[in-house]
């Protein structure tokens, strides 16, 4: 699945910043192809308000 960072992590709680970094995203507009696994889905779900997800 493809994830794209759509909103900034500035001013967000540290655990959300860490989750976005763990997903491999750094700047707004960064995209990444990730495996669709339960662990990744949980990470994406915890910061879904910052991301755009394409199946």
Swiss-Prot record:
Under CDD domains, the record lists: Ribosomal_L30
Q: Does the keyword Ligase apply?
A: no
Example of a GO biological process term: translation
Question: What Gene Ontology cellular component terms go with this record?
Answer: cytosolic large ribosomal subunit
Please give one Gene Ontology molecular function term for this protein.
structural constituent of ribosome
Family statement drawn from the similarity comment of this UniProt entry = Belongs to the universal ribosomal protein uL30 family.
Q: Subunit structure, briefly? A: Part of the 50S ribosomal subunit.
For this protein, the record's HAMAP family field holds: Ribosomal_uL30_B
A matching Pfam family: Ribosomal_L30
Domain of life of the source:
Bacteria
Q: Which NCBIfam families match?
A: rpmD_bact
Taxon lineage? Bacteria, Thermotogati, Deinococcota, Deinococci, Deinococcales
Sorted keywords for this record are: Ribonucleoprotein, Ribosomal protein
Source organism: Deinococcus deserti (strain DSM 17065 / CIP 109153 / LMG 22923 / VCD115)
The protein's name is: Large ribosomal subunit protein uL30
């Amino acid at each position: 699945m493809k994830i794209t960072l759509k909103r900034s992590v500035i001013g967000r709680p540290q655990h959300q910043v860490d989750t976005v970094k763990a997903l491999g995203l750094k700047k707004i507009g960064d995209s990444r192809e990730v495996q669709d696994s339960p662990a990744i889905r949980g990470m994406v779900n915890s910061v879904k308000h910052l991301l755009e997800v394409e199946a």
